[in-house]
């Protein structure tokens, strides 16, 4: 049975968390978004702890967050020069920003909200957050 375009869109775009849709976490290469049956795989790849963290950050910040990079398939991660053990490949990391970003302020909110890994990227105006299970801090000024 062929679905209508509206039904196809509704099946593809699934709300995960309070503020985010699954497509916001998709690998930008779009190579591995669906399984062999045509079902969206992102709801199985993205760690719920990450979604919960981002919801808390968004709530605390009070303005929309934008996900620059969420899940990355291993191939795309290698293409962009990501670490081989990148949290993005595990579905446990996101690079986030907001309009008028203050990197230090966003990083402090991420820490208050329980982020494990926090990377400040001042030159590109985003903060990496993850739920790796232990604390890690870095920035692009080092």
Model-assigned labels for residue ranges:
Residues 1-60, 124, 133, 141-142:
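Extracytoplasmic cell-surface/polysaccharide-interacting catalytic and binding patches
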Residues 2, 6-10, 85-142:
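Catalytic cores and adjacent binding grooves of peptidoglycan-active enzymes
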Residues 11-20, 65-70, 99:
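Short, exposed beta-strand "edge-strand" segments with a Pro/Gly-rich flavor and a Y/T-containing core
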Residues 15, 36, 80, 112-117:
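Intrinsically disordered, low-complexity segments enriched in small/polar residues
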Residues 26-28, 72, 112:
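The N-terminal extracellular segments of secreted preproproteins, especially immediately downstream
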Residues 46-53, 63, 76, 92, ...:
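Amphipathic alpha-helical interface surfaces
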Residues 51-81:
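Extended, low-complexity, intrinsically disordered C-terminal regulatory tails
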